[in-house]
Amino acid sequence: MGLSVVILAAGKGSRMNSNKPKVLQTLAAKTLIEHVVSSVEKLNPDNIVVVTGHLKEQVEDALQGRNITFVYQQQQLGTGHAVLQALPYLKEQKVLILYGDVPLISTEVLENLVDTTNYDDLGVLTAFVENPQGLGRIVRDKFGAVTEIVEEKDANDIQRQIKEINTGIYCVHKNLLQKWLPEIKANNVQKEYYLTDIITFAKADHVSINVTHPINEFEILGVNDRTQLASLERVWQRNVAEKIMAKGVSIADPNRFDVRGNLDVGKDCWIDINVIIKGNVKLGNNVVIGANCILKNCIIEDNVRIKSNSMVDGSIIREGAIVGPFARVRPECDVKEGAVIGNFVEAKKTILGKGSKASHLTYLGDSEIGANCNIGAGVITCNYDGVNKHKTVIGDYAFIGSDSQLIAPVNIGQGATVGAGSTIVKDVPADNLAISRARQRHIDTWQRSVKKTDK
């Protein structure tokens, strides 16, 4: 089955009050038009044509690297005029026409429209909605056949009562478009060339009109302002949350959970409120994610606990490990089985060995820490000399006392102990105690200063 796709994306979207085109507003961290393109790409069309207009360079940059032909509509003269600009770039086959600001349209709905529309038919996707205000109405004759689509600005009082609306999504052969598009006239209030006029031409030419409907009403909702954008964001997120819960994951409040990428989940996980997923994230079984956590491009293995207000980015947290609360795991970390990254601990480009613990107030950067180590409160691996980063290596079973600074590059041997408050600048041999601090003195003649008082 041959198929071409036309996506109309020339609109300015003035109600957005934005410096970028409407189709480049984001929903779930993807632009509106990227959502649409992703849905149609799954149909494996022969070509995709995007009709641009306002700030066309921005739209082209956003879709760079995809197999798309861009066509510029210099004057905004309506949807019929927009499709006419794309006509020379279409193959002699079925053409699917849709909009770049309808982000939740599913591949399944589009596929049904294409599959049920014969080569000599006109396929129209319509929907029944409770509030059709602002939308084009589907007018039918007494036999139920579609006769025309009337835009609200051109509709009479009776037509405005109609609940069946035009979604603006069509499937029609290029040969019919070549005949009909030049015949469209701007005989309307807006003085624009409406694509909806092809319904009238189809009736006149005795072309069958195939009508299909979406699975869910939200799939055909467009975005014209930021209020509608926020509303569709919640619809999208709720839909994603329900799919995740169906896989065996408990979400404390689906209305306070955001996926801005892809989430692969195991079973019996628990996700608390205000958790944000970014990029590609994988959760194992029995994972617990506390409130207000952000997970980005990471792997969380079985039985891990990510406590509240923690961030994990570009890292792997191994089975049974604990992160947080208030912890930050930056890219290229590997937190091994049963290890602990505790409260107010930051780690970057660090391996924390199996069973090792950094429980509080610590910075671990460019570090390789062995198994069963204890990293005390306030420990800092000083990895930056002002120009280059250097590595700290800590052997198995080492004990690093609180408030110690390890000046990289430095090696702490297996089983070594660093006394609290030390500044370590040289390698520490295995099983040695290293202390580097001033000797404690008691000055019995010292007197505390007394606050002066005005006389």
Swiss-Prot record:
<comment type="subunit">
    <text>Homotrimer.</text>
</comment>
<comment type="pathway">
    <text>Nucleotide-sugar biosynthesis; UDP-N-acetyl-alpha-D-glucosamine biosynthesis; UDP-N-acetyl-alpha-D-glucosamine from N-acetyl-alpha-D-glucosamine 1-phosphate: step 1/1.</text>
</comment>
<keyword id="KW-0479">Metal-binding</keyword>
<feature type="binding site">
    <location>
        <position position="377"/>
    </location>
    <ligand>
        <name>acetyl-CoA</name>
    </ligand>
</feature>
<feature type="binding site">
    <location>
        <position position="151"/>
    </location>
    <ligand>
        <name>UDP-N-acetyl-alpha-D-glucosamine</name>
    </ligand>
</feature>
<feature type="binding site">
    <location>
        <begin position="78"/>
        <end position="79"/>
    </location>
    <ligand>
        <name>UDP-N-acetyl-alpha-D-glucosamine</name>
    </ligand>
</feature>
<comment type="similarity">
    <text>In the C-terminal section; belongs to the transferase hexapeptide repeat family.</text>
</comment>
<protein>
    <recommendedName>
        <fullName>Bifunctional protein GlmU</fullName>
        <ecNumber>2.7.7.23</ecNumber>
        <ecNumber>2.3.1.157</ecNumber>
    </recommendedName>
</protein>
<dbReference type="GO" id="GO:0016020">
    <property type="term" value="C:membrane"/>
</dbReference>
<dbReference type="InterPro" id="IPR050065">
    <property type="entry name" value="GlmU-like"/>
</dbReference>
<feature type="region of interest" description="Pyrophosphorylase">
    <location>
        <begin position="1"/>
        <end position="226"/>
    </location>
</feature>
<feature type="binding site">
    <location>
        <position position="330"/>
    </location>
    <ligand>
        <name>UDP-N-acetyl-alpha-D-glucosamine</name>
    </ligand>
</feature>
<feature type="binding site">
    <location>
        <position position="73"/>
    </location>
    <ligand>
        <name>UDP-N-acetyl-alpha-D-glucosamine</name>
    </ligand>
</feature>
<feature type="active site" description="Proton acceptor">
    <location>
        <position position="360"/>
    </location>
</feature>
<feature type="binding site">
    <location>
        <position position="437"/>
    </location>
    <ligand>
        <name>acetyl-CoA</name>
    </ligand>
</feature>
<feature type="binding site">
    <location>
        <position position="224"/>
    </location>
    <ligand>
        <name>UDP-N-acetyl-alpha-D-glucosamine</name>
    </ligand>
</feature>
<dbReference type="GO" id="GO:0000287">
    <property type="term" value="F:magnesium ion binding"/>
</dbReference>
<feature type="binding site">
    <location>
        <position position="374"/>
    </location>
    <ligand>
        <name>UDP-N-acetyl-alpha-D-glucosamine</name>
    </ligand>
</feature>
<feature type="binding site">
    <location>
        <position position="166"/>
    </location>
    <ligand>
        <name>UDP-N-acetyl-alpha-D-glucosamine</name>
    </ligand>
</feature>
<comment type="similarity">
    <text>In the N-terminal section; belongs to the N-acetylglucosamine-1-phosphate uridyltransferase family.</text>
</comment>
<feature type="binding site">
    <location>
        <position position="402"/>
    </location>
    <ligand>
        <name>acetyl-CoA</name>
    </ligand>
</feature>
<keyword id="KW-0961">Cell wall biogenesis/degradation</keyword>
<keyword id="KW-0677">Repeat</keyword>
<dbReference type="GO" id="GO:0000902">
    <property type="term" value="P:cell morphogenesis"/>
</dbReference>
<dbReference type="InterPro" id="IPR029044">
    <property type="entry name" value="Nucleotide-diphossugar_trans"/>
</dbReference>
<feature type="binding site">
    <location>
        <begin position="99"/>
        <end position="101"/>
    </location>
    <ligand>
        <name>UDP-N-acetyl-alpha-D-glucosamine</name>
    </ligand>
</feature>
<dbReference type="InterPro" id="IPR018357">
    <property type="entry name" value="Hexapep_transf_CS"/>
</dbReference>
<comment type="pathway">
    <text>Nucleotide-sugar biosynthesis; UDP-N-acetyl-alpha-D-glucosamine biosynthesis; N-acetyl-alpha-D-glucosamine 1-phosphate from alpha-D-glucosamine 6-phosphate (route II): step 2/2.</text>
</comment>
<keyword id="KW-0012">Acyltransferase</keyword>
<keyword id="KW-0460">Magnesium</keyword>
<dbReference type="InterPro" id="IPR001451">
    <property type="entry name" value="Hexapep"/>
</dbReference>
<dbReference type="InterPro" id="IPR011004">
    <property type="entry name" value="Trimer_LpxA-like_sf"/>
</dbReference>
<keyword id="KW-0573">Peptidoglycan synthesis</keyword>
<feature type="binding site">
    <location>
        <position position="363"/>
    </location>
    <ligand>
        <name>UDP-N-acetyl-alpha-D-glucosamine</name>
    </ligand>
</feature>
<dbReference type="InterPro" id="IPR005882">
    <property type="entry name" value="Bifunctional_GlmU"/>
</dbReference>
<dbReference type="GO" id="GO:0008360">
    <property type="term" value="P:regulation of cell shape"/>
</dbReference>
<dbReference type="GO" id="GO:0005737">
    <property type="term" value="C:cytoplasm"/>
</dbReference>
<comment type="function">
    <text>Catalyzes the last two sequential reactions in the de novo biosynthetic pathway for UDP-N-acetylglucosamine (UDP-GlcNAc). The C-terminal domain catalyzes the transfer of acetyl group from acetyl coenzyme A to glucosamine-1-phosphate (GlcN-1-P) to produce N-acetylglucosamine-1-phosphate (GlcNAc-1-P), which is converted into UDP-GlcNAc by the transfer of uridine 5-monophosphate (from uridine 5-triphosphate), a reaction catalyzed by the N-terminal domain.</text>
</comment>
<dbReference type="GO" id="GO:0009245">
    <property type="term" value="P:lipid A biosynthetic process"/>
</dbReference>
<keyword id="KW-0511">Multifunctional enzyme</keyword>
<keyword id="KW-0808">Transferase</keyword>
<dbReference type="GO" id="GO:0019134">
    <property type="term" value="F:glucosamine-1-phosphate N-acetyltransferase activity"/>
</dbReference>
